[in-house]
Amino acid sequence: MQPNDITFFQRFQNDILAGRKTITIRDASESHFKAGDMLRVGRFEDDGYFCTIEVTGTSTVTLDTLNEKHAQQENMSLDELKRVIAEIYPNQTQFYVIDFKCL
């Protein structure tokens, strides 16, 4: 069985599969992905594979520069997005946006 390249919390699986979540915001440890990469996607909780995505672009962002477009691409409100990012990555301010499409 092939290993997964990237994982998402299970609560995001349906939004990814339905095309409602089209970006992910990660820390420096996952800043190496680039446009054109095909990634096997698994659930964080059990590493179970659930789809393949294509990276369509990357950019950098800070907690302060997150905006409504980012929130829309994450399928949540801006306040919720900032809260989730702060919970997942406490004490960090620089992040990497990975734009993707589900294949």
From Swiss-Prot:
It comes from the Bacteria. Its EC number is 3.5.1.135. It is an enzyme of class 3 (hydrolase). Coiled coil: none annotated. One of its GO terms (cellular component) is cytosol. The active site is at K21 (proton acceptor), T24 (nucleophile), E74 (proton donor). Gene3D superfamilies: Hypothetical protein. GO terms for molecular function: hydrolase activity, acting on carbon-nitrogen (but not peptide) bonds, in linear amidines; N4-acetylcytidine amidohydrolase activity. The keyword Hydrolase applies. SMART domains: ASCH. Residues 6-94 form the ASCH domain. Keywords: Hydrolase. It catalyses: N(4)-acetylcytidine + H2O = cytidine + acetate + H(+); N(4)-acetyl-2'-deoxycytidine + H2O = 2'-deoxycytidine + acetate + H(+); N(4)-acetylcytosine + H2O = cytosine + acetate + H(+). Belongs to the N(4)-acetylcytidine amidohydrolase family. Catalyzes the hydrolysis of N(4)-acetylcytidine (ac4C). PANTHER family: UCP029143 FAMILY PROTEIN. This is N(4)-acetylcytidine amidohydrolase. It comes from Salmonella schwarzengrund (strain CVM19633). The gene is yqfB.
